[in-house]
Amino acid sequence: MEPEVVAAGIVKKRTFKKFSFRGVDLDALLDMSIEDLVKHFSSRIRRRFSRGLTRKPMALIKKLRKAKMEAPAGEKPASVRTHLRNMIIVPEMIGSIIGVYNGKTFNQVEIKPEMIGHYLAEFSISYKPVKHGRPGVGATNSSRFIPLK
């Protein structure tokens, strides 16, 4: 900061980047109908919505609404568990906490605005990443000569 500003005692307010999804701000996204919202999604997700929402995703959204209504003001809503890894995140879900099943456990995922248009599965990894060990017996000649620890 400039010394004149510090000497005057004026503190400049920090400005944060306002979230927007494909040029539309968050408040407008929350007010949009699903038909208008789908126009901003990628083609894969537009196709998914055009084929219709079945009963299961709608049941999850109803449970999320109920959890938000029952939560006290200023508190996070209760977690809602689901196996629906193929559910697409819509603006209505923002702020909710969802337990996404990965085949073994439910991973807690707090929905943030940046997640709109992604699948729930992208935030709950279903496999354990490989930690490679030492080269084995059948390894090639060049990889056998890695110095031992």
Curated annotation (Swiss-Prot):
Localisation: Cytoplasm
UniProt-listed Gene3D superfamilies: 30s Ribosomal Protein S19, Chain A
InterPro entries registered for this protein in UniProt: Ribosomal_uS19, Ribosomal_uS19_CS, Ribosomal_uS19_euk/arc, Ribosomal_uS19_SF
Domain of life per record: Eukaryota
Signal peptide annotation: none
Broad class of the protein's primary localization: cytoplasm
Family label: Belongs to the universal ribosomal protein uS19 family.
Matches recorded under PANTHER family: RIBOSOMAL PROTEIN S19P FAMILY MEMBER, SMALL RIBOSOMAL SUBUNIT PROTEIN US19W
Protein name, as recorded: Small ribosomal subunit protein uS19w
Native species: Arabidopsis thaliana
